């Protein structure tokens, strides 16, 4: 940085990790191959993500999977969760330490980490099972605030999200538990997680809100619609919902149509696109005695 040579401080790490970090530092200017131990590759990846202008992207994970295999890539992700990097800019010191302290904000997962999700989804069953077992076995050794990533990587096993939620919801407020909404399916756990919709709002995120909303619907279908209720007035989630031909999606949009002009416009477009779902939604609203919402939706349908 600023053409100055940084120094490293990893004295807070265990002896085993100190040896790993020292080996990684010796490889910074060398050839980085999957012949390196996976913990060393994890340190090198963490340094790239934290200390360079160009963040580690999906193609880096693609290369690791291609050269080292999916199990190796899984090991890299597991080890990556166990370390953290801080940069003391004033003294130009890069500090590597255990990742035990949770931030008080919702930390986004890197594109590098999330790319493993795609590779796992494309793997043959036997290989997927091996990688899934690695990830599940690693959970007790990963700091609590980073454990939701494991559930996120294994949407085929919502019970992992349920176990993490049941274990951590009553202990402390961890912003990262918001991520469990993407893969959890249990109604009671989802209801408990609702307290996390403010101020974190994973489905209202500027960068990925629409993507995660669409992902949940693709993986879980219309059964996932109720969890979007707190986010229906937001642009990113609602822009996805207006393309869903289902009465409950229309019900959600009609309920918030009076909030803003954009909310009303989305509801109007959805009613025009899916008139039968709109009529079913109006019938449901009338049955629940939601008079104001019914009047707004009815007026929109009559305009069409």
What are these regions (language model features)?
Residues 206, 210, 234-238, 250, ...:
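Residue-level detector of extended alpha-helical repeat arrays and alpha-solenoid scaffolds
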Residues 1-153:
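Non-catalytic protein-protein interaction scaffold segments in large eukaryotic complex-forming proteins
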Residues 295-303:
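Residue-level detector of conserved catalytic or cofactor/ligand-binding positions
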Residues 112, 116-200:
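Long, low-complexity, highly charged intrinsically disordered regions
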Residues 160-167, 177, 187-200, 219-228, ...:
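Amphipathic alpha-helical scaffolding segments comprising HEAT/armadillo-like alpha-solenoid repeats
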Residues 260-263, 271, 290-294:
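Helix-start/N-cap signature of alpha-helical segments
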């Amino acid at each position: 940085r600023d053409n100055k040579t940084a120094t490293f401080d990893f004295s807070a790490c265990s002896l085993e990790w100190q040896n790993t970090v020292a080996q990684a530092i010796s490889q910074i200017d060398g050839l980085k191959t999957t012949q390196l131990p996976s913990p060393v590759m994890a340190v090198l990846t963490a340094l790239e993500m934290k200390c360079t202008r160009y963040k580690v992207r999906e193609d880096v994970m693609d290369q690791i999977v291609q050269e080292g295999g999916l199990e190796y890539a899984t090991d890299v992700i597991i080890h990556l969760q166990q370390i953290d990097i801080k940069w003391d800019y004033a003294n130009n010191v890069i500090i590597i330490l255990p990742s035990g302290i949770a931030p008080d904000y919702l930390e986004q997962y890197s594109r590098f980490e999330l790319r493993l999700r795609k590779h796992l989804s494309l793997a043959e069953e036997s290989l997927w099972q091996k990688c899934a077992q690695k990830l599940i076995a690693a959970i007790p050794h990963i700091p609590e605030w980073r454990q939701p990533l494991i559930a996120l990587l294994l949407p085929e096993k919502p019970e992992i999200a349920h176990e993490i939620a049941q274990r951590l919801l009553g202990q402390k407020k961890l912003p990262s538990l918001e991520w469990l909404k993407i893969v959890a399916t249990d109604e009671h756990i989802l209801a408990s997680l609702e307290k996390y919709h403010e101020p974190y709002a994973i489905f209202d995120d500027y960068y990925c809100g629409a993507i995660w909303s669409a992902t949940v619907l693709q993986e879980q279908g219309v059964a996932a619609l109720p969890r979007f209720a707190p986010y229906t007035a937001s642009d990113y989630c609602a822009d996805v919902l207006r393309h869903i031909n289902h009465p409950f999606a229309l019900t959600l949009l009609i309920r918030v149509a009076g909030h803003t002009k954009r909310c009303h416009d989305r509801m109007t477009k959805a009613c025009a696109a899916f008139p039968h779902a709109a009529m079913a939604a109006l019938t449901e609203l009338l049955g629940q005695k939601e008079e104001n919402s019914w009047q707004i939706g009815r007026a929109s349908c009559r305009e069409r």
